[in-house]
Amino acid sequence: MINENIFRAYDIRGKADEDLNDDIIRKIGIVLSEKILKTGQNKVYLGTDCRLSANRIKKSLISGLCSNDLEVLDLGMVPTPIVYFATKIGKTNCGIMITGSHNPKEDNGLKMVINDGAVSGFEIKNDVINLK
């Protein structure tokens, strides 16, 4: 069951091991890959912060993103502005940052940019919930 409260105005946030489990993150990756591909892009930058859950989330997210043959350009562990900067000067204007930001260490989340615009968690909520 998906906690619908993880989908927020400017991002996705929740308890890393409960709300952002592997299945949910993979579904988010699939939905984001579909949105990105609809814009004519076929690549996405991906960065992580230093939270302990970041690598697990990254692995599941990449699985979902690559299910539609999207190329993931892994920036590794970087500050969030590096992902935004890469989308301005790099090979694509799409990026995802896995970050818990200022939230407690048990939390994590995703900040997403497609075609230079922030993606609201609300925008993809129904698609993620309805994905089988």
Question: What does each of the following model-derived ranges do?
Answer:
Residues 2, 9, 13-132:
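Gly/Ser-rich phosphate-binding catalytic loop and adjacent alpha/beta segment
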